[in-house]
Amino acid sequence: MKRESSTQLRAGFTTGTCAAAAAKGAALMLRDQCLCDQVTLRLPTGISATFRLEGQEFSSSSASCFVVKDAGDDPDITNGAELHARVTVPPPLPLAQGDMVEITGGTGIGRATKPGLAVAPGEWAINPVPRRMIQEAVGEVFADRRVLVQISIPDGELRAQKTLNARLGILGGLSILGTTGIVRPISAKAWTDTIDTALDVARACGCATVVFSTGRTSELAAQEWLKVRGARFDFGDQESGNADREPGTMYLEPLPEEAFVMMGDHVAHALRSARERGFHQPVIACQYAKLVKIACGYENTHAAASDMDLARLRAWAVEAELPSRVVETIASANTAREIAVSTGFDPALLTLTARKALQASQGHATGAHPLFVVADYGGRIVFHSLPAENNA
């Protein structure tokens, strides 16, 4: 995959693709009893790609090699990781599965510990599509023999510390991921996939609601604030998995770690995904600038995808007859942060902005009724729109 121009970004390959390529290379060396420098692999999209093999070793009973992951121009924590595969035949122990190709994890591969993931608790975090890719790649070489394939990433546990794996319930290393086999550069899909997975875990763990955050500062502030204050949420509905609770009733319940989901700038996707999973009243923790962008109706609040429309904010303030000092501050300010700080996080202004944000959110996801928690720039909660039962 060569760069075609100075502006075109280069795609890369998923961990699943690299693991399958390494497994095929090891299988070929084991069968042919000679070194193999590269392999060609057919991806789920139907295209083929060729991969260079490194660290090749083989004996009469096993072979191993690795592929260095190239994520292209995608800022991926797994870029440069070594995806190792060892193929053994006959397997040292009877295979636990009925498949001709059994796949296990080794060093640096995580295990699932929570429900709601693509693999069951206790299983190696090798997702279904990569698993199938490995089985098919090795099956091409050993069509009628049972073999054991072990996938490992030497520094996988260290790399995993920079991911959300632990929060999602994947411990001990990285996940082997991918659906198309290709990593699209600077794509939002990796982030939105993580949001979806986190919501699946939250639902499977029985969370009453979820708390989205736009950044780590607002998330930490919300976690601490909710832990100290406690919170009541209207989550009595059939879809949420709490059918024994009456709709419209407020319940006091602590929120577990799984309830906190980092959505970043992907507000519309997060709201729709939450609604699809029965979370109709999520909490959104953010700073004031993000609240303004949510109120303006942007699906994505990143600076590259949204403008800070202070003129609209001023029009809302005038229409709501907010104090003249607030209106004047908005008119003269250059940033939402300046407005928030200069007005002392004026309660009427924040209430107005949260109301507009609620209306905009319902445009993204019909039936959604998010609650808002706003943190100042020192990590302290200065506003919330939680129900009256929470006003201690």
Curated annotation (Swiss-Prot):
GO terms for biological process: anaerobic cobalamin biosynthetic process; methylation. Keywords: Cobalamin biosynthesis, Methyltransferase, S-adenosyl-L-methionine, Transferase. HAMAP family: CbiD. One of its GO terms (molecular function) is cobalt-precorrin-5B C1-methyltransferase activity. This is Cobalt-precorrin-5B C(1)-methyltransferase. It comes from the Bacteria. InterPro entries: CbiD, CbiD_sf. Its EC number is 2.1.1.195. The keyword Phosphoprotein does not apply. It is an enzyme of class 2 (transferase). Pathway: Cofactor biosynthesis; adenosylcobalamin biosynthesis; cob(II)yrinate a,c-diamide from sirohydrochlorin (anaerobic route): step 6/10. The keyword Glycosyltransferase does not apply.
